[in-house]
Amino acid sequence: MRAALFWTAIAVASTATGVAAAADNLKGTYGLVGAQVCLVAPAGFKQDSNGNLTIPIGETNHSQLTTEGLVIYHGDGTGEARQTFVTIVPPPNPHGAAVSAGTISYSFTYTPEGDNAYRMALKPGSFQGMLNAGPNAGQQFSIEGESRLFRVSDDRKKITVAIDKPYVQKITFSGSSQPVPRICTSISNQSLVDESVTVGKGR
């Protein structure tokens, strides 16, 4: 029951990714704020008439999240992020309403996709999450499957990020080998904090 509640409560926003007009020279630290909503379907999703996995199977629940953090671009098409988040699971919910909070960190790559637009992908095995408040405080988790589109201003000082198409993420919690499928919507904004890649390293 507690694990099921946690699946609902955690909607980690790996929303902290973006790129610049020249992917090979985007370098610096950006501050991030964002929001995310996830639909969790423990039994998975089936295809719609166009072949997209968008139709939930069986019972579902949803969660709402806000996040803040730092994103560091290394200047070589790779980056890393560290974020905090607060998640609310509103009623009605089969496992009850809940509030949770925690931290995440991950590494990513990004590739060009149109004018000033780029596609982000998580580096496999790099995502680490920890719940430090809520019904399942102390639970660790990881996420597989992440794709976001971001657009960068010409001066590289601002980045907008969004999930632009539905896809299934899989979130796995410590103590369980069974990943939980979900589909999320997400938006975030980033602003240049410093051209250094060491800002916030002590967070």
Where are these regions (language model features)?
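Bacterial N-terminal signal peptides that target proteins for export
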Residues: M1-W7
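Mature soluble binding/inhibitory domains
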Residues: A21-R203
